[in-house]
Amino acid sequence: MLRNDVLDALLRRDAAAAGQALQALRGLAPTHPALAALDTLTEALQRDGEPALPLAPAQALPALAQLEQRVAPAALAQLGAADGHAWLAPLWRTLALRAAALPFNPQQSDVHAAPLWLRAGDWQAAEAAVQGIASWRRIPAPLGWMAEARSRRLGLDAAWPLLVELAWLAGPRLAAVAKALGDPLLARLLRRFEDHLDPGLHAETPALAWWPAWLLVDQPALLPHLRLAEAGQDSAPERTLRLLAELLGLEREGRHAELMAARKRLRDLHPALYAAYMRSR
């Protein structure tokens, strides 16, 4: 019963009441298994009521570790997944505000404000934080943050160009973004790609770099979104997507001779993709 009093106070974000209920619980049941977790949550709530002072670079990682490794597990264990995530959001928001002045550091990217805003559930603030990073569209971490924020704020259609660029730039980061989003369509399309496309002569190229080109073969209706991806490093996967977009245009226009020549170029670029394309014809 006293544990429930602590939990109720925590959910109300009443730090004083939580502290009093926790003290009563400790007095009556000093070996209660939830004491350590409840103490962690009460302390976190008390600290969140203090002024949110900017983080110095040396403070950033310890502050993130405290919230990520101690407070968050305690909240999920004691409050449950739904209430726990909702309870944690203001704490992530406070940490994001404190990290706002920290520059992007590729070696410590997790302590930038953008991923903290994502964890707080503020997609617009996450986008704004990413836009403050120079050349963010050429760096895997901020490109992934922007793709996630854009998808959550505006839907998957708005994020397709960013996801394409991420596939070309850093396949593992794309996989991480897809896992974080939990979008059924995105997960299904990635799974289908893994199940159906043989890398063929291009085993040295990261497999997910070919996903955008395969995606256009499998889902040609996505062409208006995929073609908005910005030019990258002119890699073979990027050239293949552009070529497939050209092929779809030639088909619509009935330009047979040019279509045959473009198909030959596709076959030379990636035989397995060419075979997948021809199967759909």
Question: What residue ranges belong to the model's regions?
Answer:
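Conserved small-residue packing positions in alpha-helical repeats and bundles
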Residues: 5-9, 35, 39-40, 47, ...
